[in-house]
A protein has these predicted regions:
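Short solvent-exposed strand-capping/beta-turn motif centered on an Asx-Ser/Thr pair
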Residues: 36-41, 86
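Cysteine-clustered segments with highest specificity for TGF-beta superfamily mature ligands
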Residues: 79-83
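C-terminal interaction-tip segments
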Residues: 1-29, 33, 85-100
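Solvent-exposed residues in well-ordered beta-strands and their adjoining turns
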Residues: 37, 51, 74-76, 97
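Solvent-exposed, conformationally flexible loop/turn segments
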Residues: 14-18, 62-67
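Short, surface-exposed beta-strand/strand-loop-strand elements in extracellular ectodomains
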Residues: 40-59
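Beta-sandwich interaction modules
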Residues: 65-78
């Protein structure tokens, strides 16, 4: 089995629920870190779902601040990570390990 450390998603959040990552076929992914940054001068909120189960719901990230979520959450083939935020000034950086 090949194990590959990987950036699963890096980019700006949408204000509606958006698919950020889908586990490829015949693969298990372990999500290890999620960094949420807010580049605005006012606070914003975000939501994250792992396979449609809420991980974080309407969590505030302060103005010009970051939040780090460290976890070891396995996802199997076709499972997803989704997210959204109250403003497009929120960015997600999601990393993990793919095992194929």
């Amino acid at each position: 089995m090949a194990t590959t450390s990987k950036i699963l998603f890096r980019g700006a959040a949408s204000t509606s629920s958006t698919l950020l990552y889908t586990v490829p076929a015949s693969t298990t992914t372990v999500v290890t870190d999620i960094v949420i940054t807010n580049t605005a001068a006012s606070s914003a909120t975000y939501e994250l779902l792992l396979n449609d189960i809420v991980l974080a719901k309407t969590v505030t990230v302060g103005a010009n601040d970051s939040t780090i979520i460290q976890l070891k959450q396995p996802l199997t083939a076709t499972q997803t990570v989704k997210g959204l935020a109250s403003a497009v000034t929120v960015n997600f950086h999601i990393s993990g390990v793919e095992i194929a």
